[in-house]
């Protein structure tokens, strides 16, 4: 099948080009993070709620790659809970046009499996670590697995990863005071520490009002202490990344409530049930699964994605308290 011409690069009516696909492969997670799945994973009960198969994943990734996508992040839920996770990595990594294959994981299985992930073609890893205090880690995640996750990060370096990104969801009265400890941790480690503002979702209004804290205070602190903003490349995410000559690590800030946050949007999302989401906080998903049954449906699939892109909003509406249809972040992979 012919690749898309340059004119068919996935692009919306605001001339934003989409180089980055966030592909969820499961909604299931074995952690119970307060800001995501505080009561743990509960199946939807829908008969038709099986997650994307490996052939379906291959087809959707190929369509995106043929239209200019060069980076795929495999998300969940917890993607490593899929028994075929390594096969998924290999399938994505061997798709012509895909240059970066990343995953976001809770790190629970990393110590045992990360060598296999790397061999399969995983180029980048993000691990969620919301506290360096084992007791607070347990309180936030619902699991007493701090040591296992830390061992997983060290193992990633041992098998050859030059950098690991660590995601920290900022929460007032829980972990927002831990900046000095985190800075000390990354001083001699090539970790990009990413502080993510707590985001409002449909089921988390109370948590948001109680624990939301802006990343602006951290940014001001970093700048005052000699940290410098890095230039962003076209396939990077929305993080403002800061570097310091005395630190091996970096700091990223993800602040969705910041003005013009959506201006540099370069990613699209496909859920584990095969729906296209134009925005993490959009009103609805677009069914793609009926066009993932056969290889010869690719042109139709591309046309559907391209036409839906023309309906993508210029911005989310979080400032109006409109969180869209996202009940929790596990539902479409954050």
UniProtKB/Swiss-Prot annotation:
Every Radical SAM core domain range: 13-239
Keywords, comma-separated and alphabetical: 4Fe-4S, GTP-binding, Iron, Iron-sulfur, Lyase, Metal-binding, Molybdenum cofactor biosynthesis, Nucleotide-binding, S-adenosyl-L-methionine
Matches recorded under CDD domains: Radical_SAM, Twitch_MoaA
Residues engaged in binding [4Fe-4S] cluster 1: 29, 33, 36
Binding site for S-adenosyl-L-methionine: 35, 77, 128, 199
Binding site for GTP: 22, 73, 104, 165, 267-269
Extent of the signal sequence: none
Pfam families on file: Fer4_12 (PF13353), Mob_synth_C (PF06463), Radical_SAM (PF04055)
Catalytic reaction annotation: GTP + AH2 + S-adenosyl-L-methionine = (8S)-3',8-cyclo-7,8-dihydroguanosine 5'-triphosphate + 5'-deoxyadenosine + L-methionine + A + H(+)
Subunit and partners: Monomer and homodimer.
Protein's UniProt name: GTP 3',8-cyclase
Organism: Vibrio parahaemolyticus serotype O3:K6 (strain RIMD 2210633)
């Amino acid at each position: 099948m012919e690749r898309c011409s340059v004119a068919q690069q996935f692009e919306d009516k605001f001339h934003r080009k989409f180089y980055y696909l966030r592909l969820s492969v499961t909604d299931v997670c074995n952690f119970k993070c307060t800001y995501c799945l505080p009561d743990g994973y509960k199946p939807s009960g829908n008969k038709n709620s099986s997650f994307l198969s490996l052939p379906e994943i291959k087809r959707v990734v190929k369509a995106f790659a043929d239209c200019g996508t060069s980076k795929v992040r495999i998300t969940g839920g917890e993607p490593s809970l899929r028994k075929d996770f390594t096969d998924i990595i290999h399938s994505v990594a061997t798709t012509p046009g895909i240059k970066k294959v990343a995953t976001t994981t809770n790190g629970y299985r990393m110590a045992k499996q990360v060598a296999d992930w790397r061999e399969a073609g995983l180029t980048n890893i993000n691990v969620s670590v919301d506290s360096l205090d084992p007791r607070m880690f347990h309180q936030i995640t619902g699991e007493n697995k701090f040591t296992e996750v830390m061992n997983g990060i060290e193992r990633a370096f041992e098998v050859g990863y030059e950098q690991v990104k660590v995601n920290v969801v900022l929460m007032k009265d829980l972990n927002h005071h831990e900046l000095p400890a985190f800075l000390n941790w990354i001083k001699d480690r090539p970790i990009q520490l990413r502080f993510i503002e707590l985001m409002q979702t449909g089921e988390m209004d109370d948590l948001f009002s109680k624990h939301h804290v802006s990343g602006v205070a951290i940014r001001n602190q970093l700048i005052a202490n000699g940290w410098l903003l890095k230039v962003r490349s076209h396939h990077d995410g929305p993080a403002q990344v800061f570097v310091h000559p005395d630190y091996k690590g970096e700091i990223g800030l993800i602040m969705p409530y910041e003005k013009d946050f959506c201006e540099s949007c370069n990613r699209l999302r496909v859920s584990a049930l095969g729906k296209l989401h134009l925005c993490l906080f959009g009103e609805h998903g677009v069914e793609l699964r009926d066009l993932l049954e056969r290889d010869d449906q690719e042109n139709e699939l591309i046309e559907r994605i391209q036409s839906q892109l023309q309906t993508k909003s210029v911005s989310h509406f979080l400032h109006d308290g409109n969180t869209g249809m996202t009940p929790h972040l596990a539902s479409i992979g954050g």
